[in-house]
Structure formats: C-alpha cells, structure tokens
Amino acid sequence: MKVQQEAVNVLERTSAYLKSGILKKTPAWYNVIAKVPPTKKFARTPQLTHPMNGKSRTALPDYSNWKANSSGLYKTRPNSLEKKDGASKLYQSPKLVYIEDKLRKLFFQQHPWELSRPKILVENTLETQEYDWSHIQQLGKPLDGESVVQRTLFLLKSGEKKELIDAYDQARFEFYRLRIQQEIQDQVAQEEAEMFGSVFHTTSIEYGIAKEQKVIDTWKRKALQQAELMAARASSPSASWTNETEEEQKPIDQDVEEIQL
C-alpha cells in the first residue's frame, strides 16, 4: 500500500491558494507550519548515537574485566538475546533526560510534604528565565522546590560551585533558612491577631476530619458490640438467641448520626 503524503504538502498548497487569490486571509496556523514544516521522510532510520550524550547505542558490554561466576566460568561475548535487544533499541526514540528533572525528583523525595502546599495553575506559566537567580527569593514567585532547582543551576553556570551536590546543598540550605523565617512570621502574626481578639475557626480539613472521626467512633462501637455478641454466642448458644432478639428490636438507625456539611 502506498504511503499517503498529501497531508504534508498542506503548506505548499496553502501558499499556492494565497498566491492565486483563492484564499483571501492567511490561516492562523500558516506561520507556525512555515517555521516548523512537517517531515517528508517516512523511512525509519536507526539512531546509532544518543542525541543527548553522544554515546553509541550499539556498543556491547566489555567482558574482558569480568570475574568468574560461581561455576568458575568466564563470559567472553554477548549472547543472542543481548544482541537482539541492542538492535531493537536503534529504532526506538531515545529518552530525553534533563538535569532539572533529576533535581526535582531528588528534592521532592527528600521533602514530600512540599507537594501538599497549595499551588495555583498560573504559577506553572511563569517563565523562570525572567528572574535573577543570584538569590533564591524572588518577587512575585512563591518559595518552592522549583526555586531550589533554578538556584542550583545558577550556581553551576556562574561557577560559584563546581560540583552539583555542593550547589544543591547550598540552595537547599538557603531554602531552609527562608522557610523557617516564613513560618516564624506566620506564627507571630497569628499570635498578634489572637492578642487583639481575633478568633480562628477550624479549617475545612479539620472540620472534615472531625466528622469522619464521629463516623469511625460509631463504627467502632458497633464492631465491639458485634464482637461481644459473637463471643457470647460461641460460649453459650442458648443465651445468644435472646441477645440477638433484643438487638433486632432496636431501631436500625439508632447510632447513625446524620453528617451535615
């Protein structure tokens, strides 16, 4: 079956329509497609080198320095399965790895509670290149894990720190100092407000937890009663029928409390 390639000629066809006057108005996508035209090569070509680090993707492991296994045998060459895996990777898209992603993963693994802080979607649209990362605190941007990442990269690019771990530690310690300062300021502001008569009610999360705890307590009380009933039934089957009859006479919704949100 012949590969259909008419869709990739949309730029040339639209240009001809504009030139001949068939189209009076330039489409909104015209300039974008002109800057990044679609590819016309549909043949899969093997990528022998990785585009990120330039390493060969066909190189097999060197077994010359390998030690003997438990049987006392040495492995001197790759087997057919290893050769097959190496050949199949030539046509796969290489994974793009950025140092920023590694720093973000490390930071949030060490500080998982930073993910629980509220965040608005507008913060993701801010360009980090507009800020001066010679200091970690920025005007108009909240202090978060991304500040640590960008501060670390600035220390590496400026030459203040030559090692990645040293730059990350310095940015992390600056983050700790500012975070402690913010928490102290919030605590002092709350104490001053309470001193002047302000009353802080429970938050939505605390209110939900309290309602949930009431349901859990009701369930626990019923579970204990059911466990006692089963134990009594196992020890004295004749007496258990009397208790069971009394339990059936009770209204079903006696211990159920309506949760008003």
Curated annotation (Swiss-Prot):
GO cellular component, one term: mitochondrial small ribosomal subunit
Annotated PANTHER family: 37S RIBOSOMAL PROTEIN S25, MITOCHONDRIAL, SMALL RIBOSOMAL SUBUNIT PROTEIN MS23
Lineage: Eukaryota, Fungi, Dikarya, Ascomycota, Saccharomycotina
Keyword tags: Mitochondrion, Ribonucleoprotein, Ribosomal protein
Pfam families: MRP-S25 (PF13741)
Statement: the UniProt record of this protein carries the keyword Isomerase: no
InterPro entries reported in the protein's UniProt record: Ribosomal_mS23_fun (IPR016939)
Compartments where located: Mitochondrion
Region (Disordered) residue spans: 233-261
Gene Ontology MF terms: structural constituent of ribosome
Protein name as catalogued: Small ribosomal subunit protein mS23
Family as reported in the entry's similarity comment: Belongs to the mitochondrion-specific ribosomal protein mS23 family.
Description of how the protein assembles with itself and partners: Component of the mitochondrial small ribosomal subunit.
